[in-house]
C-alpha cells in the first residue's frame, strides 16, 4: 500500500477473490506502444512499419525516447553581440508528429533526454548518446518545455494537444538513465517541469516517475510523499512493467 497523504490502516479496502469472482477487465493493452528514439520516425522504413502496426493492432498513443536529444535538433544556441542566445527548431519534430498523426496515433510525450548544450554532465546512454544528466540551468529547461508545448498547440490545436499525456523523463531510478539515480534531483526536475507545463495550460496531464523494476516501490512511495508535501497535484503515476528482480546476465545479454 502506498501511503499518500497520511493514509492509515482504516483506509485499506479488503478485496476477496474466489475462483467464481467476476469483474470487468479494463484492457489497456492497446493504449500505448513503445518505440525507440523519436528520430527513427524520420525514416520511410520506420513509417512503413508503423502503418502496418496500426493496421493490424491500432494503438492509441506512442511513446519514445529522445525528444530533446541532439538528433532532433530542437535546442539551438548562437552568439550575438557577445551573448549566447537560444532558439528552437521544430523541423524534425513536426515531421515525426505528422507521421504519427497520419496513422491515427497520439504522442505520449516523454520529456528527455538532455540537449548537450544544456546538460550539466557528459553521461550518455545508447549508441545514439542520449545525455542523461540534469540541466545545468533549470530556467532554460523550463523555457524549452514552454516553447515546445506552445509550438505543438499552435500546430495541432489546443484541444488536441492537451489530450497527449506528458511524462517527465524515463526511468530515473536507473543510473544509466539518470546520473547517479539521484532521487532528489529527479524530484526537482519533476517539480519544475510540472509547474512549467501547467503554466502553459493547466489542462495538460503530467505524470511520473516512470520508474523500472528493482527500486520501484521505494521510488513511488517517495514520489507520492514528495508530491503531497509540495502540493503537486500529479495527474498520474507510472511504473514500467518489467521484472522486479535484476535480470540474469549471460555475457553482455540480459534476460528477465
Q: What does each model-identified segment do?
A:
Residues 1-4, 252-256:
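Short intrinsically disordered, low-complexity coil segments enriched in acidic
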Residues 1-60, 64-65:
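Mature N-terminal, pre-catalytic/accessory segment of carbohydrate-active enzymes
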Residues 57-255:
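Substrate-binding cleft and catalytic face of glycoside hydrolase catalytic domains
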Amino acid at each position: 500500500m502506498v501511503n499518500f497523504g497520511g493514509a492509515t490502516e482504516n483506509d485499506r479496502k479488503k478485496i476477496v477473490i474466489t475462483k467464481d469472482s467476476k469483474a470487468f477487465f479494463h484492457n489497456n493493452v492497446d493504449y500505448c506502444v513503445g518505440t525507440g528514439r523519436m528520430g527513427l520516425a524520420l525514416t520511410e522504413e520506420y513509417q512503413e512499419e508503423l502503418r502496418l502496426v496500426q493496421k493490424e493492432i491500432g494503438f492509441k498513443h506512442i511513446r519514445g525516447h529522445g525528444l530533446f536529444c541532439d538528433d532532433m535538433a530542437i535546442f539551438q544556441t548562437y552568439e550575438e553581440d557577445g551573448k549566447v542566445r537560444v532558439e528552437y527548431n521544430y523541423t524534425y519534430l513536426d515531421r515525426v508528429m505528422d507521421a504519427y498523426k497520419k496513422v491515427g496515433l497520439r504522442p505520449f510525450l516523454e520529456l528527455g533526454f538532455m540537449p548537450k548544450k544544456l546538460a550539466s554532465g557528459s553521461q550518455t546512454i545508447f549508441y545514439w548518446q542520449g545525455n542523461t544528466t540534469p540541466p545545468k540551468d533549470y530556467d532554460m529547461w523550463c523555457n524549452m518545455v514552454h516553447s515546445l508545448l506552445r509550438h505543438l498547440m499552435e500546430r495541432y490545436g489546443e484541444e488536441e494537444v492537451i489530450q497527449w499525456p506528458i511524462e517527465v523523463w524515463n526511468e530515473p531510478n536507473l543510473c544509466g538513465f539518470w546520473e547517479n539515480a539521484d532521487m532528489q534531483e529527479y524530484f526537482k526536475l519533476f517539480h519544475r517541469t510540472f509547474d512549467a507545463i501547467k503554466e502553459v495550460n493547466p489542462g495538460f496531464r503530467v505524470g511520473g516517475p516512470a520508474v523500472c523494476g528493482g527500486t520501484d516501490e521505494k521510488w513511488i512511495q517517495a514520489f507520492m510523499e514528495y508530491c503531497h508535501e509540495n502540493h503537486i497535484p500529479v495527474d498520474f503515476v507510472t511504473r514500467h512493467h518489467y521484472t522486479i528482480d535484476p535480470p540474469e546476465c549471460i555475457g553482455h545479454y540480459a534476460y528477465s
